[in-house]
Every structure is written in structure tokens, then in C-alpha cells.
Amino acid sequence: MALKKYKPITNGRRNMTSLDFAEITKTTPEKSLLQPLPKRAGRNNQGKLTVRHHGGGHKRQYRVIDFKRNKDGINAKVDSIQYDPNRSANIALLVYADGEKRYIIAPKNLKVGQVLESGEEADIKVGNALPLQFIPVGTVIHNIELKPGKGGQIARSAGASAQVLGKEGKYVLIRLRSGEVRMILSTCRATIGQVGNIQHELVNVGKAGRSRWKGIRPTVRGSVMNPNDHPHGGGEGRAPIGRPSPMSPWGKPTLGKKTRRGKKSSDKLIVRGRKKK
């Protein structure tokens, strides 16, 4: 999809861009694959705020996505490419030969009318899902499982992908977009290709109101709060932090502090850590 620019008729529109949705072929979602999505405004079941900056936004319905791709041996035709308000990637509606309908994440260059399949004997072409042991070295993949049968967890957002680097015993080496090289069980599944809608990261929101439509509330700096609200708060005028390093609102070191647990079971599966920026 290409980016759409707007005439600067107001300050909010001056640098605003949006996607032209040229890839979208159908605007009404499949009713049988919809679920209600009530608003939580960042609160848990006790009504306590657990996630800041959430609230408001346009009404949404959840689209049930097939991350497992476990319907083997039955061909599926791509019926339409659709917009999903709950994720950055577009979604594709598949209609299987037996009549079942499922949504999947739409890979780049997927076209309406294409026939997809999943399983050990599927062809190596965009949109097909296979166990990693049957995917050739060098192939670009997305929607990668970490545990067999759990469903894809890695490389699911717009433009995301990973690459198969090699095979060692029961593991397959995968290079992620972060530069991390990781071993994943060869029985885990992945989908061929890169996730579509790659221009998503280039969109300029342009104005605060557009963030509110998405359900994103303002982020207030800690330095302008009172000392009872934030460790950076208080002082006369524009006071410095007054601490050795920046702190989160709960008094924990942040901005550069590593938060990964020291001895995590999956550490032994990471061959090379992610690249430092």
C-alpha cells in the first residue's frame, strides 16, 4: 500500500500521512469470525489501572485469527484481503475446500484467488505453512511457533519477517529482525514470506486526535508531576531528575536498564543476542 499525503490546510494536516488501502478488497468482515471486544481502559478485573495511556478510541470487534495453520491436506482459496483494527498487518480470509472459513495474517504479495495449503507436503510459496524442518535454508518466514501446536508468536506485525539460517539436530536456527539468532524446535510451524503492509511504520499520525481514535491517551512526563506521583517530580521550575539514573513511575531504573530475567530457561536456545543499537 502506498502512503497518502494531505494538503496542509490545517496544522494537524501539515505532515499527516495515511495508507491508501489499495490492497483491501473487502470492507465488511466475516460475521462468523467476529467476537466482542469490550473496552478495559487499561484496568484489570478490580478496576485498578494496570496499563497506562489506554482508553477511549473507536469501537472494535475482534477478528479470530488462525495462528496455528493446522488444517493440513485441504486447499484454501484467498477470498479477500481485509483491514484489521486490532493489529498493524492486514488479514486474509481463506475459504477451504470443505467450506470452512479462517482468517490469517496477510503476507506481502498475497493475491485474491491464490490457493494456499499447510502441512509437511505444502509447496514453498508465499502464504503456505509448514514445519520448520521442511523449509529450505535461506527462506524468509513469519508467524513462527515457539512451541509445537501453540500457534505463531514471532514475526506477526506489519513488515515483520525472520530467516532460516541452518539446521542442527532437532533444532532449526532462525535469525530474527533484531539480529538475534535463536534455536527453535524443527516441529514448530512457520508461514512462508514476509508480513504485508510494510509501509505501516512510515505513517505520520499528524495530530493528537488521531491517536485518541486509536485508543491511545496522552503520555505525561514525570518531570512535570508532583513528587508523590513520580520519582522525577517536584523541585523548583525545570529541576533535574536528582537520581543516578532515570526511574519508572514505580521507582525502578529504566531507559537502558535490562529487564530480562537472569536465568531464563530459553537462554540456552539463544545462539547470538540481538544487535545493540
UniProtKB/Swiss-Prot annotation:
Keyword Ribonucleoprotein: yes
Function text: One of the primary rRNA binding proteins. Required for association of the 30S and 50S subunits to form the 70S ribosome, for tRNA binding and peptide bond formation. It has been suggested to have peptidyltransferase activity; this is somewhat controversial. Makes several contacts with the 16S rRNA in the 70S ribosome.
Classification via NCBIfam families: rplB_bact (TIGR01171)
Keyword rRNA-binding: yes
Lineage, top ranks: Bacteria, Bacillati, Bacillota, Bacilli, Bacillales
Family to which the UniProt record says this protein belongs: Belongs to the universal ribosomal protein uL2 family.
Record-level GO BP terms: cytoplasmic translation
Pfam family, one: Ribosomal_L2
Entries under SMART domains matching the protein: Ribosomal_L2 (SM01383), Ribosomal_L2_C (SM01382)
Span list, region Disordered: 36-55, 213-277
Organism superkingdom: Bacteria
Protein's recorded name: Large ribosomal subunit protein uL2
Keywords: Ribonucleoprotein, Ribosomal protein, RNA-binding, rRNA-binding
GO terms under cellular component: large ribosomal subunit
Self-association and partners: Part of the 50S ribosomal subunit. Forms a bridge to the 30S subunit in the 70S ribosome.
Gene name per UniProt: rplB
GO molecular function: rRNA binding; structural constituent of ribosome; transferase activity
